Amino acid sequence: MKKIKKAIIPAAGLGTRFLPATKAMPKEMLPILDKPTIQYIVEEAARAGIEDIIIVTGRHKRAIEDHFDSQKELEMVLKEKGKSELLEKVQYSTELANIFYVRQKEQKGLGHAISSARQFIGNEPFVVLLGDDIVESEVPAVKQLIDVYEETGHSVIGVQEVPEADTHRYGIIDPLTKNGRQYEVKKFVEKPAQGTAPSNLAIMGRYVLTPEIFDYLKTQKEGAGNEIQLTDAIERMNNDNQVYAYDFEGERYDVGEKLGFVKTTIEYALKDDSMREELTRFIKELGL
């Protein structure tokens, strides 16, 4: 069984929920405190043992490449001014993994974005991490899925429970059997209509996929939103070769929409020793 050393991070979306801020800045570069959201995703992959990451980008995404590249002029200035802590942070972001880029030329959905990286992945299993979800956990969420893959040899999809009222916003699994936090899956349903979801176990932006998925994506017809949906291709693959789901442990932060982004920023700030006390005082002063 091949070890998983490669990851795909899709980052080609237009970020329309954050306009006009994302007109000139990639959504993935919006910061949670002092780090862009995409760095949290790359850090999770690196902690899970991933060595090579391909980021699928689109137009106006050059800032992502610049962020993970070295900037010698800035490093020199920080060094001359004795700002060693900032220098270390800047250098750290360039040393997380080997990062490559491919452009998704058309906005045709998540499945199409994954297909764009086929040449990079080759005939190896790989992980996918979506940038809308930051997960805080002792064992990285995607590493939990890798562990299941290493036991089963099959693709594994990360899930967590959501309120039934929200199931229409997610891909949902119809579980067949359960073993602890691990499920065999009868069916995958992409964004079921309100009240029709087979469970409240939602796909949460973390995947381990075998390379066979590319064959299914190649022939996948357009689905929800007239896009090539990854969930639809996984469902077809599951009909031929069992796909597992795993209810990963960890606190998930939804940074793909404005309210979730604000909540995440506040929660991370409250965890920061340098601002917790003053921020707590400020919140109390608001008298909410």
Swiss-Prot record:
<dbReference type="GO" id="GO:0006011">
    <property type="term" value="P:UDP-alpha-D-glucose metabolic process"/>
</dbReference>
<dbReference type="InterPro" id="IPR005771">
    <property type="entry name" value="GalU_uridylyltTrfase_bac/arc"/>
</dbReference>
<keyword id="KW-0808">Transferase</keyword>
<dbReference type="InterPro" id="IPR029044">
    <property type="entry name" value="Nucleotide-diphossugar_trans"/>
</dbReference>
<comment type="pathway">
    <text>Glycolipid metabolism; diglucosyl-diacylglycerol biosynthesis.</text>
</comment>
<keyword id="KW-0119">Carbohydrate metabolism</keyword>
<dbReference type="Pfam" id="PF00483">
    <property type="entry name" value="NTP_transferase"/>
</dbReference>
<comment type="similarity">
    <text>Belongs to the UDPGP type 2 family.</text>
</comment>
<protein>
    <recommendedName>
        <fullName>UTP--glucose-1-phosphate uridylyltransferase</fullName>
        <ecNumber>2.7.7.9</ecNumber>
    </recommendedName>
</protein>
<dbReference type="InterPro" id="IPR005835">
    <property type="entry name" value="NTP_transferase_dom"/>
</dbReference>
<dbReference type="GO" id="GO:0003983">
    <property type="term" value="F:UTP:glucose-1-phosphate uridylyltransferase activity"/>
</dbReference>
<comment type="function">
    <text>Catalyzes the formation of UDP-glucose from glucose-1-phosphate and UTP. This is an intermediate step in the biosynthesis of diglucosyl-diacylglycerol (Glc2-DAG), i.e. the predominant glycolipid found in the S.aureus membrane, which is also used as a membrane anchor for lipoteichoic acid (LTA).</text>
</comment>
<dbReference type="GO" id="GO:0009246">
    <property type="term" value="P:enterobacterial common antigen biosynthetic process"/>
</dbReference>
<keyword id="KW-0548">Nucleotidyltransferase</keyword>
